[in-house]
């Protein structure tokens, strides 16, 4: 087996539980983020470095020292309380999930009923979905400014509706 180490935050139960479960078949060393980096070929973390918060700083130190591949675990995109996304060297669209040409079986097993085919008609609204400004996926931009600009551009294409993230309590309310 390759040299794999899992770096965990001892103060975030959700992250700890996910990483421990991930480690069951691997049985590789787990190292508290507070202990710092330990050399390995593959580094596993829950999430990526964040500009905000102590945990984000600790993960950044691990990323800065590690020269090999990163396997990153994050909460999934659907049924987020049940599923996780696991990808190489990034999150969201910047990760390699090794899912090219995957069969539809896993997707079909989700039995998701709320999804409809894409509707193309002139009466549809364009929905811009918000994000909490401290999320790692938007930490590299001014998210409020981005929302303002993208809504302005999209207004030429039809009615735009902004929906804030359910956990965002006010940072972009003026867009609604």
What are these model-predicted stretches?
Residues 68-140:
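A nucleotide-sugar donor-handling region in carbohydrate enzymes
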Residues 7-10, 147-176:
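Catalytic donor nucleotide-activated moiety binding site of glycosyltransferases and closely related
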Residues 11-18, 52-55, 80, 136-137, ...:
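Short, charged/polar "capping" segments at the starts of alpha-helices
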Residues 1-50, 134-135:
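N-terminal pre-catalytic "stem/leader" segment of glycosyltransferase-like enzymes
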Residues 3, 123-127, 159:
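Charged active-site motifs of nucleotide-sugar-dependent glycosyltransferases
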Residues 51-79:
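A short, gly/pro- and small-residue-rich
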Residues 46, 73-75, 163:
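Generic beta-sheet signal
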Residues 15-23, 52-59, 141-153:
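Well-ordered, non-membrane alpha-helical segments in soluble/globular domains
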């Amino acid at each position: 087996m390759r040299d794999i180490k899992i770096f965990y935050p001892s103060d975030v139960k959700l992250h700890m539980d996910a990483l421990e479960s991930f480690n069951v078949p691997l049985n590789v060393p787990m190292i508290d983020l507070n202990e710092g980096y330990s050399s390995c070929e593959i580094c596993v973390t829950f999430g990526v470095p964040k500009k905000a918060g102590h945990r984000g700083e600790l993960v950044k130190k691990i990323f800065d020292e590690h020269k090999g591949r990163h396997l990153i675990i994050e909460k999934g995109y659907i049924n987020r309380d049940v599923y996780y996304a696991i990808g190489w060297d990034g999150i969201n669209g910047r990760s390699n999930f090794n899912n090219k040409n995957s069969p539809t079986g896993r997707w079909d097993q989700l039995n998701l009923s709320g999804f409809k085919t894409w509707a193309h008609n002139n009466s549809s609204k364009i929905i811009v979905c918000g994000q909490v400004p401290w999320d790692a996926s938007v930490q590299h931009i001014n998210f409020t400014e981005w929302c303002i600009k993208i809504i302005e551009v999209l207004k030429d294409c039809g009615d735009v509706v902004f929906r804030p993230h359910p956990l965002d309590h006010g940072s972009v309310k003026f867009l609604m």
